[in-house]
Structure formats: structure tokens, C-alpha cells
Amino acid sequence: MKNKSPVADPKLIEVLESLSLPIYCGQGRKLFMQGEACNGLYILESGEAAQVLNAASGRTVYCIHTGSGSLLGLPATVGNEPYSMTAMVKKGSKVRFVTRYDFEKLVEAEPQLYPGVMQLLAAEVRSARLALSET
């Protein structure tokens, strides 16, 4: 099942970008794997990505296609949990990385950013539920 991911508020992205480092994705790459320890989130500045959730059997249960303005790995970063999906970006995508530590310090220093983070997480939950209801 495929779905399109919600996009983050441009103000939130702007603040996160100020703390981020560029990630080379010239040939496309896997950013993180389902079950891997979370070390931060990724900002998809341009290009395309897919986030895939697999069952223990290896069967793909859910797939989200993302575009510019998406934050990949946000639920794991906020929850301090392993990544719940695998994220891959296509060749030529522009991606930036924010460490979990830097994200936590930012939200502590600027708590007014939290409503935007929560809205994005809620949109991801709604999107996943809608996709699951279509099966």
C-alpha cells in the first residue's frame, strides 16, 4: 500500500536546517533501516524518497512516498526509539541531517516549535490510518 507523506511547516524546516549537515545522495542511498537505533532526522530539501514498513516476514506492509519538505525519522527522533521504517532517497536528492541531540536541544530552547512537530506527527498517524483502512 502506498501513500504520500505530510510536509513540514517551512518555518520548522528553516530552523532545523540551521543545525543540519548536508548528506551526499548523488547515487541515491538508504538513510536508515527499520529497527536501527535512531541518531537523528533527515530533511528532504529536494528530490524523492520512500519510507517502507515491513512485517517480520519481510512483506511490505506500508510505503510512504515523500517529496521536498518532508522530515524523515521524526517519530523515532521525538520518541527516542529505533526507526520504525526504512528510508531511501532517489538519485540526486538533496538531504540534510539533524542529530537527535541537536533536535532535543532546539526544542528545549524553542518550545514554540513543538506544536508544528506535533501537527506533523498527527498528520503521519492520520495518513497511515487512512492507508491501512484501504486494505
What annotation goes with each model-predicted range?
Residues 1-135:
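Cytosolic regulatory regions built on CNB/CRP/Popeye-like sensor folds
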